[in-house]
Amino acid sequence: MPRRREVPKREILPDPKYGNVELSKFMNVIMEGGKKAVAERIIYGALDFIEKKNPDKDPLEAFTVAINNVKPMVEVKSRRVGGANYQVPVEVRPVRRLALSMRWIKEAARKRGEKSMALRLANELMEATEGRGGAMKKRDEVHRMAEANRAFSHFRF
């Protein structure tokens, strides 16, 4: 790792339709191979689908609630102590929390069976707002691992 200077965080511009920075970050997570227009179409399609299903709810609010529900509070990191590897529970930093929740929602949506990615993403987001779905399962699994290894929490980093 270079020891020079800390690289400054790049400022991400808000998305054109809703003016939301988090949505713009999620667009970058969904994007593959630099195809931002495709990622944009998928996300806006998913949000439109959410709006059609629940006309009284704001789709951006549903997106925010889903992201916040999936955010992990703790995770485990491997730590080698005296020839043995321990899974040590550590608190997740806010930036990583957001990144993990977005990544997990994307992965859970990819594994779903619906036809289009927009539909998969919409259903995954709606399930995450209700506290269920693949991404929530992943978060609960990570929390369970941290809880199971709570005895090793004194091996701090």
From Swiss-Prot:
One BP annotation, GO: translation
Keywords: Ribonucleoprotein, Ribosomal protein, RNA-binding, rRNA-binding, tRNA-binding
Keyword Ribosomal protein belongs to the record: yes
GO molecular function terms listed in the Swiss-Prot or TrEMBL record: rRNA binding; structural constituent of ribosome; tRNA binding
Highest taxon in the source lineage: Bacteria
Any GO CC annotation of this UniProt entry: small ribosomal subunit
Family: Belongs to the universal ribosomal protein uS7 family.
Quaternary structure, from the entry: Part of the 30S ribosomal subunit. Contacts proteins S9 and S11.
Function: One of the primary rRNA binding proteins, it binds directly to 16S rRNA where it nucleates assembly of the head domain of the 30S subunit. Is located at the subunit interface close to the decoding center, probably blocks exit of the E-site tRNA.
Protein name stated in the entry: Small ribosomal subunit protein uS7
Organism of provenance: Variovorax paradoxus (strain S110)
Originating gene: rpsG
